């Protein structure tokens, strides 16, 4: 997240104002985050204020440091509710795993150098979360079109040990997000 120091260096001390940074509130502008950082933010929301250092081996206790975020716990329930509604009534409803209460946010990342990127962040299940995820599909357009279904299938595999929604799986596997790519 850019600081005042960053903006003073980038624009000069009198070269920026509130209008310069308003796009930060919707995740645009000079914000640079990795998918791993986005997944960590989902874990922090799912856990109401903490996340564990990402690790490759779940039995590696040396790597499981707990990090807390400086957000008052009273704010998490409303964020959780809003993210749950994405799957119940919003852009994620077509990708909901049956019988799993899910939370997430679809997004479209503007790309000045080509087609927009498809983004999804989320966690499941809503109660007692087991997985937090972030998926970015470059040059693929809307988050609900590509990143949300891919995330949903990955979460389903993780939670259930299999993917039962073969139609969605086949669609993802057999499709391309790049119209320049020819199918064999």
Stretches found by the model and what they are:
Residues 38, 143-148, 152-155:
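Short, charged, low-complexity patches
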Residues 1-140, 176, 181-184:
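Beta-lactam-recognizing serine transpeptidase/beta-lactamase-like catalytic domain environment
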Residues 112-114, 145, 163:
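Active-site-proximal flexible loops/turns
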Residues 130, 142-144, 161:
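Intrinsically disordered, low-complexity acidic/polar segments
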Residues 62-67, 150-184:
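Short, gly/Ser/Thr-rich active-site loops of penicillin-recognizing serine hydrolases
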């Amino acid at each position: 997240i850019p600081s005042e120091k960053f903006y003073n260096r980038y624009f000069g001390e009198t070269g920026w104002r509130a209008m310069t940074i308003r796009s930060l509130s919707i995740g645009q502008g000079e914000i640079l985050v990795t998918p791993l950082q986005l997944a960590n933010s989902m874990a922090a929301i799912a856990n109401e204020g903490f996340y564990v250092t990402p690790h490759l081996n779940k039995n590696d206790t040396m790597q499981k440091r707990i990090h807390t975020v400086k957000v008052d716990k009273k704010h998490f329930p409303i964020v959780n509710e809003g993210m749950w509604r994405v799957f119940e009534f919003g852009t994620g409803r077509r990708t909901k795993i049956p019988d799993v209460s899910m939370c997430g946010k679809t997004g479209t990342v503007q790309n000045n150098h080509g087609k927009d990127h498809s983004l999804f962040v989320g966690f499941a299940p809503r109660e007692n979360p087991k997985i937090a995820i972030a998926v970015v599909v470059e040059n693929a357009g809307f988050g609900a079109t590509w990143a949300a279904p891919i995330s949903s299938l990955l979460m389903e595999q993780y939670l259930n040990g299999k993917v039962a929604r073969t139609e969605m799986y086949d669609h993802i596997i057999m499709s391309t997000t790049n119209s320049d790519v020819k199918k064999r």
